[in-house]
Regions:
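Active-site-adjacent pocket scaffolds in enzyme catalytic domains
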Residues: 1-72, 126-128, 139
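C-terminal domain-boundary segment and adjacent tail
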Residues: 55-139
Length: 139
């Protein structure tokens, strides 16, 4: 918090972003989820894995989140690593899931910073205003 970070992604404890407050400063927690290439390829950077099965898993995860979003907001943080999905045999799978996601209505592709800023400005606006640090004039 003291070094200007906007968000953290260490928690597995929630499904949706939430606020951490300490010492009058606020940090958005963007909870991690087991979605992405590390889980489906089991962090095997050089093993072949099975890109076809991985794509089916990713589509099923995304489709469920998208269906749930019709009832209430969802947060689906897929994590892709260049050393895992950037391999020639896996890049096509990555392109395929992105194309699948782009076909769905109401999907926002955003960085962690963009999501955290949106949470502060829109979702947690009232909470953030209460916890915002006060500016003090220097003498």
């Amino acid at each position: 918090m003291e070094h200007g970070y906007l968000f953290n992604s260490n928690s597995f404890s929630h499904d949706l972003p939430f606020l951490w407050e300490a010492g009058g400063r606020v940090l958005v927690e963007l909870p991690r989820q087991p979605f992405g290439d590390g889980r489906t390829y089991q962090h095997r950077a050089n093993d072949a894995g099975n890109p076809h099965d991985t794509l089916l898993i990713w589509k099923a995860m995304f489709d469920e989140f998208h269906e749930e979003s019709r009832v209430s907001p969802t947060y689906c943080p897929f994590q892709f690593h260049p050393y895992i999905s950037g391999r020639p045999g896996r890049a096509k799978t990555l392109r395929s899931i992105i194309q699948h996601m782009k076909k769905a209505d109401g999907v926002w592709f955003a960085t962690g910073s963009e999501v955290a800023r949106w949470c502060l400005d829109e979702v947690f606006k009232a909470e953030h205003a209460k916890a915002a640090p006060r500016k003090v004039a220097a003498s």
